[in-house]
Amino acid sequence: MNTRRPVASLWIGEKLHYLNQLCLKSHVVAGHKTILYCADKVDNAPEGVEVRPASEIMEIDRELVAATSASFLSNVFRYKMIQKTGAIWIDCDAFCHQPFPEDQEYIFGRHGMSGALNCGVVGL
């Protein structure tokens, strides 16, 4: 039985890019249940990635995306998803080179050599 915390992300669009496919698959290979919440029908998710409708977390307002950006909406989605599911948020371009620690409640990705935190990987 897999005891690792699940990881999850959001995709707004119909097709994943090759890099996103590789990165999502890396989490599957590391042993994490990997969920991709989608605003559109996506048919090229890697094997092992569970595709679910983004509406399970929140409705995706296309007018808001058009007026701001998908990134803006993704920021709101990420924290709602963490609150509702307890999964670790991963950006679709975050590669997993080792499983996330099972005994850590808080997980944050680092950015660059300075060690600054970013919101591309977040577990709360």
Indicate residue ranges for each PLM-predicted region:
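Short, charged, surface-exposed secondary-structure boundary motifs
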Residues: 19-20, 46, 59-65, 116-122
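Short, polar loop motifs at secondary-structure junctions
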Residues: 37-43, 94-99
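GT-A fold catalytic core of metal-dependent nucleotide-sugar glycosyltransferases
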Residues: 70-124
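N-proximal low-complexity "stem/linker" segments adjacent to membrane-targeting elements
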Residues: 1-18
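Active-site-proximal specificity loops/subdomain of glycosyltransferases
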Residues: 42-80
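Short, hydrophobic beta-strand segments that form beta-sheet elements in well-ordered domains
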Residues: 31-39, 88-90
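Residues that flank catalytic or metal-binding motifs in active/ligand-binding sites
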Residues: 3, 30, 117-118
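Short, well-formed alpha-helical segments that are part of the catalytic scaffolds
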Residues: 15-29
